[in-house]
Amino acid sequence: MANTAQARKRARQAVKQNEHNSSLRSKLRTSIKAVRKAIETGDKAAAAKVFAATQATIDKIADKKIAHKNTASRQKSRLSAAIKAMAA
């Protein structure tokens, strides 16, 4: 239990930040699912459009260190490869 006023405040801030970060991670997972769904439908143009928006989301979350930069890079790479493989 937090004993000082500063520790109590930091505990409150940690809870608030955790909720915010959780919502951003959820947004990231939702956008990745949207790209995968677009890939499954077979519409390459739509998949590329959704991927562009998802790529921006992934970058923002990696910049805020909510997701590791290597994880973000791997996700973008795999989604991009899946879109490129649609033509083949």
Curated annotation (Swiss-Prot):
Q: Which InterPro entries match?
A: Ribosomal_bS20 (IPR002583), Ribosomal_bS20_sf (IPR036510)
What is a biological process (GO) this protein takes part in?
A: translation
Instruction: Return one GO MF term.
Output: small ribosomal subunit rRNA binding
Keywords noted in UniProt? Ribonucleoprotein, Ribosomal protein, RNA-binding, rRNA-binding
Q: Which domain of life is it from?
A: Bacteria
Query: Does the keyword section mention Manganese?
Result: no
**One GO CC annotation:** cytosol
Please verify whether the record's keywords include Cytoplasm: no
Region entry Disordered, spans: 1-29, 69-88
Q: Which HAMAP family match?
A: Ribosomal_bS20
Q: What does this protein do?
A: Binds directly to 16S ribosomal RNA.
The text of the family note is: Belongs to the bacterial ribosomal protein bS20 family.
The protein in question is named Small ribosomal subunit protein bS20
- Which organism does this record belong to? Polynucleobacter asymbioticus (strain DSM 18221 / CIP 109841 / QLW-P1DMWA-1) (Polynucleobacter necessarius subsp. asymbioticus)
